[in-house]
Curated annotation (Swiss-Prot):
Recorded GO CC terms: plasma membrane
UniProt protein name: Glycerol-3-phosphate acyltransferase
Gene that produces this protein: plsB
Subcellular localization(s) per the UniProt record: Cell inner membrane
Pathway in which this enzyme or protein is active: Phospholipid metabolism; CDP-diacylglycerol biosynthesis; CDP-diacylglycerol from sn-glycerol 3-phosphate: step 1/3
Amino acid sequence: MPKKNSPLLPKETTTTQSSVDTSGSSNLTWPVSEHTIRRPLWARLLGQILDPWLDLSIEPEHSVQYNDGRPIIYVLEDYGLCNTLILDKACRKTKLPSPLIPLSGNPLQRKRAYLALSRRSSSNSLIPNQRGGKTHSDSLANLLQAHRIRDTLDVHLVPVSIFIGRTPDRQSGWFAVLFSENWALVGRFRRILAILLNGRNTIVCFAPPISVRQTLNEGLPPERTLRKLQRVLRTHFRRIRETVIGPDLSTRRLLVDNVLATEAVREAIGAQAKRDGTDLSETWRKAQAYAWEIAADYSSPVIRSADFLFSHVWNRIYAGVLVHHVDSFKEISPGHEIVYVPSHRSHMDYLLLSYCLYKCSIGLPHIVAGINLNLPVVGTLLRKCGAFFIRRSIKGNMLYSVVLSEYVAQLVAGGYSLEYFIEGGRSRTGRLLQPKGGMIMMTVQAFLRQPRRPVLFQPIYIGYEKLMEGTSYLDELSGEPKKKESIWRVFWNIPKVLKQKYGQVVVNFGEPIALNDVLAELAPEWEGQALNENEKPAWLSSTVNHLARQIQTRINSAADVNPINLLALALLSTPKHAMGEADLIAQITLCKKILLELPYSNRVTITPHTPERIIAHAEQINILTRVHHPLGDVLRVDGDNAVLLSYFRNNVLHLFTASAWVACCFKNNRRMSRIALIRLGVGMYPFLQAELFLPWTEDQFAQHIQQVIELFVREGLLLSAGNEEEDPLTRNTSQTDEVFRLRAISHSLQQAFERYYITISILVKNGPGTLSASELESLCQLAAQRLSLLYASTAPEFFDKGLFRGFIQKLRELNLVWPDTYSKLLFDERLDTSAKDAQVILGRELRHTIERISPEATKPAPK
């Protein structure tokens, strides 16, 4: 932002913005004195009313080049009474001729000496088919015509830019910020409010004069001369506005027309019109409606207003918002097209991440949001904060798909940063969901079409201690349909939200992913050349899938371990979700030791609080209940809180994969060799990696298991007879504290192995060629629900269909199962081997229960 007294205009000008030419003469002169022709009475009266509210900063300070006796006409960006009065005051302050006193001869054919390129629109958006305003200024056309008629006439145009409240201080009220200057063309009432609130911070910029005569002497046809002069003036106003208030980010106004003008959209409109049997104009309006439905309406004043508002909200409901690893991101991000890809746990993700970026002085991205959030008032505010809305499903709607793709392409080509959630929706279980590659595909294709600016994907982990949507997640996991968002529900829940305390929020920036590096690895045949709009290389889909999984893996590698995560890991390992205080402290201590001594990655952050402080914090936010007892206090979680805690356990489940695997192997076995433990772990790893987005190769996972073994031996959880591969590892036989802690660690992965065994058991029981993948999913879900009822109460996510789907998909990728010509799954004896391996982990009673309840497919009744 330029300093208040610095010149805003470049020293050099275009050929039409010529320096002052003293040659020639003009028969137009200004009145010698304002006493000869006075300003209109209405202007004097209104000026006196407005003067106390205005404090003008005029640039440049010296007006010698304007006040040399030659006739000048001022050019404003748009008409408006307030603008006219401000210009008049600026002219009086600098002793320039008044814009309200016409030139002799009246070349404008109006009683004034100023004109505007455009007028404020008076159209009503509620009235369809209303004609818009003129495409050019009548006054400017009249002025050019007067110069053609009178050869001696040489009026100079002086463009004048007016900014009211361009940069309100941070100490200014948020209401004043809302009415500060931006790129939008505002109405009269809003302009008056802007003057009342920000008029004392008004800037008036006079530009160098433009000779109309020299423009005419270029010899262009009249219509082209008019268009060129208007184009020069518009370019000037835009350049000055960018200098004063920053670039125009109101993409809705700038990008919609560009989207509709692309070749791909025009072709899609033609194809859609042909399919529907409609005319092109009707289909074009349909495409335009799609573009307006999608497009953001970025507003800097609204962003600044939201900062004032949400600073108070966050301080009220959160105990702080911490941001980690942002400095390293700021070092490498310049010069890149940034795509923020955060985890998606809550509706608050949209607001929190934008708030953090704003506070870190990082430009806000354009955020992809589901159309379900386009509610009255809320949707408008989200659009103003940079959100653009897309439909949940676009299959079968080719026109919409093309418009959306081109909109994203325009953003990428324009250098706008993006933000989207590749999980497609909020996680109801606390795990990262399997990624959807649609938005990544659009981003990659947009880059391949115009590979000018390198793309950087920035994974971000957002961690909560308490969720606003916790109750609704419980209902949905229990089988109730998702409630449709409504503005009334939003307003109804605001008082409830403001009364709650939601603990601390942590935002961790993961390791960025450079798209060029991914393409160099997976698509070496691409050499940086631009691809056509409809060109889809064979490697594109596999590259997008790899990129999506890598993003999820990097998000998990930047996890934050907060107090509630540690409590959930400990308490949910017991049948009644309760522990004595001393046992709970010991278990939390062990979990922290595993994380600190066997670091998952250098971007994982861990709460610095002691176990005692963690327990006190959980009691403060009403997650933990203390039951006093003469033999020692018992700490527990009750009812729905226990199910909700599974959400926070799942947030960090992946961090304990290796340690939980080792502990699981000793839950039902007292003795096992190192080599057997590692061999079984490596065999199970592909399924765990697919479900939990783990970063290691199989060899790296084997090394990690070895490190866990050494730690468990040091902690006394396991006993080692030696360091050779064949040397046995043993655990204690009695119910010691070490055995208790080992079993508690194992519990976090127990349910995953139970799901795997359910799937294999149902396949084996039904035989090859009997079940399709979808039929197997449904039977697995039913069996898991029944097991939960009969054997032990579990969280609803235990029978989540998506988890079974992921396991079945991995079986297919490893060729352990494959479809026949009728899409029925086939398998061989290798599946029996996998079932035998499960005997090492699962107890006999549990295996027997699973085998007994595993359902068979319903066979059709004989005819």
